[in-house]
């Protein structure tokens, strides 16, 4: 089979720069163990990637999406919108009602049980006088 050049693939991807980026990304995928969809014919990975694009075994849009995803340093995760943050901020400035905010509180029985568990001091200055 004749060698594939960029001109053979330009009808699949209009921009030559984008074609080279996509073929290089596909070649890296092949190097890392991705399944080849055409016969290798003793060709190197970039040529195999160009042949896959030319024969439309691999879609340019899929490659482009995968390339963009691989280059992203931050992947966007859908999270609930922060509606609670303005409510907390407005609660602090409205006079500080404690009824909505429940902090670490002890009941009277828990406090008495904790005090009974304390060991009294052996000797204090108040005991002598």
Swiss-Prot record:
SMART domains: RNA_pol_Rpb6 (SM01409)
UniProt keyword list: DNA-directed RNA polymerase, Nucleotidyltransferase, Transcription, Transferase
Enzymatic class: transferase
Chain spans, region Disordered: 76-100
One GO MF term: DNA binding
UniProt-listed Pfam families: RNA_pol_Rpb6
GO terms, biological process: DNA-templated transcription
EC number: 2.7.7.6
Catalytic activity: RNA(n) + a ribonucleoside 5'-triphosphate = RNA(n+1) + diphosphate
One GO cellular component term: DNA-directed RNA polymerase complex
InterPro entries, per the entry: DNA-dir_RNA_pol_omega, Pol_omega/Rpo6/RPB6, RPB6/omega-like_sf
SUPFAM superfamilies, alphabetized: RPB6/omega subunit-like
Quaternary structure, from the entry: The RNAP catalytic core consists of 2 alpha, 1 beta, 1 beta' and 1 omega subunit. When a sigma factor is associated with the core the holoenzyme is formed, which can initiate transcription.
PANTHER family named among the record's database cross-references: DNA-DIRECTED RNA POLYMERASE SUBUNIT OMEGA
Membership in a protein family: Belongs to the RNA polymerase subunit omega family.
Physiological role: Promotes RNA polymerase assembly. Latches the N- and C-terminal regions of the beta' subunit thereby facilitating its interaction with the beta and alpha subunits.
Name assigned to this protein: DNA-directed RNA polymerase subunit omega
Native species: Xanthobacter autotrophicus (strain ATCC BAA-1158 / Py2)
């Amino acid at each position: 089979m004749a060698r594939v050049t960029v001109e053979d693939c330009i009808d699949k991807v209009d921009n030559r720069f984008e074609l080279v980026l996509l073929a290089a990304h596909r070649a890296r995928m092949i190097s890392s163990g991705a399944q080849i969809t055409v016969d290798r014919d003793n060709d190197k990975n970039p040529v195999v990637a160009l042949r896959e694009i030319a024969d439309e075994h691999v879609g340019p849009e899929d490659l482009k999406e995968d390339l963009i995803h691989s280059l992203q340093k931050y992947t966007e995760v859908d999270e609930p919108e922060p509606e609670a943050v303005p409510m907390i901020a407005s609660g602090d400035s409205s006079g500080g009602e404690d009824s909505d905010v429940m902090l670490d509180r002890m009941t009277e029985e828990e406090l008495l049980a904790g005090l009974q568990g304390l060991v009294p001091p052996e000797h204090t200055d108040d005991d002598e006088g």
